[in-house]
Amino acid sequence: MTKNNNPNIVKNSLGYDSNLYIYQDKTMFNYSVDTILLANFVFINQKIKNILEIGTNNAALSIFLAERDEKLKIDALEIQEKAFKIAKMNVDYNEKNSQISLINADFNDFWKEKIKTSQMKYDSIVCNPPFFPIKNTKQSKKLTKEMLIATHEVKLTLENIIEGSAKIIEQKGYLTMVIPVERLVDCFFLLRKYKFEPKRVKFIIPRIYDKPKLVLVEARYQAGWGVHFLPNIYLHDSENKHIHIYREEVKKLYKPIRKKEK
């Protein structure tokens, strides 16, 4: 077991009833339901062999994805050195080193270097992006520098992600993200701009009478038109906003959905 004397670092289970655990720093961005829902929304089949995660943070998403298919090879990219070190701790602890390669780099530099040095392109790219525009956001004094970079477009914008992904993804490769509903129009516009076609869209809604807050989006590079709006995910049954028990449907998604073998 990995030892750490930092009081801000805690060990949490990753999903329900699984053998996966991760260390998280309470002063940094921590995984939540959107991480899990995104990990199980990512399309995986026999043809998907290599995946890039942009902004892995503590590697929760990549570890969950690796558990879905033991043959997957994942490059997990993280710009923040502090988060990168925690990600390494988590990959080591969950024994995923044979599947996950951690890369401490800025995505804007990474994709430019990759097209110079490697002909290999990714079958799939996944990202839980820093989605708040920095100029339009009133910043809380409680927000640490690490959390600001993880949640706001300080180092990386939505357009950076989509533009760079187009350079290093296979034709008809999958780009999958979770974003706030407010950014959906921006997302569709940018996807089309860089030759991606939205294919699957799924809204995440806290309760049945609430507005959607997040949306899962899958797009494919240089693919034909045609988008499918899938049934919504409702997180909680109760209208009482003080009750936060997940619905059974959501609990089932808290376990890695393994790739079906032929």
Label each region the model flagged:
Residues 20, 49, 72, 98-100, ...:
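A structural micro-motif
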Residues 21-23, 27, 31, 154-212:
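Conserved Class I SAM-dependent methyltransferase catalytic core
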Residues 42-118, 124-127, 133-138, 163:
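Conserved SAM/SAH cofactor-binding pocket of Class I
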Residues 129-160:
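Mobile active-site "lid"/loop adjacent to the S-adenosyl-L-methionine
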Residues 1-18, 113-120, 257-262:
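Short, Lys/Arg-enriched, disordered terminal segments
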Residues 211-262:
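SAM/dcSAM-binding transferase cores
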Residues 3-45:
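Class I SAM-dependent transferase core
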Residues 38, 128, 161, 219:
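Residue-level signal for inorganic ion chemistry
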